[in-house]
């Protein structure tokens, strides 16, 4: 609790949110979920797709993969992603998946499942909790519409992955014709420190994540 209060008093928190059409991700999840569960022993959720997209976007927007050292912004070379894990509604810990930017989807999913399991069984070491450069918090598992998370100090941003629902959307074909379709849609909400960068930078970062999630060939990625 003291850490959260300190974070709010230290960083001028700003929230930027963007809606994402996850239909491309959902089609791949639906096609592979049975085989994935049999091979890996855990379910294929949206979170590793988001983590993969975030890691790639951080290469283009490095000031989000940063922390404050005193009054100086320190930009990190590696993406070490802290994953907020609930502990029976008694608090959160954020174990770190190291070098996410050097991993593909399947390995990221394995690593997230591993650190979450160690958290819930109280097997974390101090090393598991150190070195994070950016944080994901997955409130969407509870069906949230949009959450305003608190930055994990001394980092400068945290992304809330909120609930995904089936909704009508306007789709445009190759000839420019519009129609209505039912897609899986959700919100990504970014809380960020206004000392580190401005609103345009934060919005462009979210837009890059959105672009990756909506256009990447996830079928090739999952193999």
Residue ranges of predicted features:
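C-terminal catalytic/motor cores of large multi-domain enzyme assemblies
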Residues: 1-223
């Amino acid at each position: 609790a003291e850490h959260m209060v300190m974070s709010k008093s230290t960083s001028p928190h700003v929230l930027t949110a963007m809606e994402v059409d996850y239909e491309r991700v959902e089609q791949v999840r639906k096609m592979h979920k049975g085989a994935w569960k049999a091979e890996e022993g855990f379910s294929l959720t949206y979170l590793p797709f988001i983590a993969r997209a975030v890691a790639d976007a951080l290469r283009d927007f490095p000031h989000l993969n940063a922390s404050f050292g005193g009054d100086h912004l320190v930009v990190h070379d590696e993406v070490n992603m802290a994953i907020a894990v609930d502990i029976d509604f008694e608090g959160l810990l954020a174990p770190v998946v190291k070098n996410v930017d050097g991993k593909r989807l399947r390995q990221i999913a394995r690593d997230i499942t591993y650190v979450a399991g160690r958290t819930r069984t109280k097997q974390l070491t101090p090393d598991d909790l150190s070195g994070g450069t950016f944080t994901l918090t997955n409130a969407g598992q509870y069906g949230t519409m949009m959450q305003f998370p608190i930055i994990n100090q001394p980092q400068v941003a945290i992304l809330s992955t909120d609930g995904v629902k089936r909704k009508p959307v306007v789709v445009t074909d190759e000839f420019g014709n519009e129609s209505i379709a039912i897609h899986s849609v959700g919100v990504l909400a970014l809380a960020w420190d206004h000392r580190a960068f401005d609103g345009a930078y934060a919005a462009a970062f979210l837009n890059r994540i959105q672009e990756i999630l909506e256009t990447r060939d996830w079928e090739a990625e999952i193999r």
